[in-house]
């Protein structure tokens, strides 16, 4: 993490699944000496979750992964938030969630933030008149930029905001047409 150590909860999570990396002497010291200067993250949507208890059928480490993990036994299961609109891909549109994430990251780590992706995926069709009516994307970006502004107004530091990065993660999933 940004403090140069494995946090207790995350370390146990990795150990329970047999995923903890093999550490050699000096590795943890190296982590502590080489902390990040900023935090960069992608934000497209929020997810609501409910408990997903372990059972004979659902064992620790059992996961359902679609484009992103959707559930993990003993931890969580993604559920629809009926209070939010969603994109055509089912990603819930939540600008208040972006503001909350920014404030949480700033309060916890006190490192400047860079939003590396915050785009809006849609299926555009070029009409005969040659102009795509992109009101949904414009509204999405407007609301999310206002969320960044609100976070800045309470002291969150940013070093950048990118709508898309050079390599769009969604393109690998849905391709180009």
Residues of each region from the PLM?
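Active-site region of glycoside hydrolase catalytic domains
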Residues: 1-177
